[in-house]
Amino acid sequence: MTRTTKKAAAKLNTAIAGAVKRFAPPESLTVDEWADKHRRLSPESSAEAGPWRTKRTPYLEEPMRAFTDPKVHKIVMVAAAQVGKSELELNIIGYIIDQDPGSILYVHPTIDDARKFSRLRVAPMIRDSKPLKAKVHDVKAKDSGNTILQKSFPGGMLTLTGSNSASALASTPARYIIGDERDRWATSAGTEGDPWALAEARQATFYNAKAVEVSTPTIKGNSNIETSFYQGTQERWCHRCPECGEYSEIVFDNIHFDPEAKRIRGKKSWSLKSGVSWSCLLYT
């Protein structure tokens, strides 16, 4: 065999190995297991950059596991601000790209919100997570075909848009729909009507479609995310009491604190005398 033939054979072997790797079956992982293994928090968006650890946010484990349950077709999460709702969405997106690819429609309140989230959260996640970096080409890469609002990967495409964009909501078939901050959405996508209904209509041809809807709630009785929550199983996060061992929901009435008011430079200022404590229903 000549040197030229050996080089050609080596190139062919490399090409075949790459092709075979693409046909490798996905790992048998749930979303939280995938995140613990592959997700890295980026320094731009996290106070603790480095490997993702589900144990730091245990209340996200069940929603992430529900996503890989074939019996579950929609997940609704109602939660306070800054408790990990966006990280839930990002972990699900990463899992889809790497493990169960399909078209994703990721809807934010406005297109500007979508652009900002893509730059500050999605792009760093792809850059810092090896499986995603290998499958999603950088926007700046030559011939990548990707933009800030649209990113292709083997088996699917991630499209980010706003609830006020009727064209994107009405024209993009999608197996997966993810709705961020649902209570801040436009009441109508132009003249086309309810943005969520338009988005869900994009899933009509997918037997294995899944939807994720998250938001901080606004006004009780006039909240889209509240309505969606009450249409589901209405599961709530409960904390185990260190005294009796029973699980109880953490509600404001069971949180105890002793405030005191002081005047500082002529203005009333409130502070806590001795911190904050929580008690379960049996010890309230």
Can you describe what each PLM-predicted range is?
Residues 1-282:
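Phosphate/NTP-binding elements of NTP-utilizing enzymes
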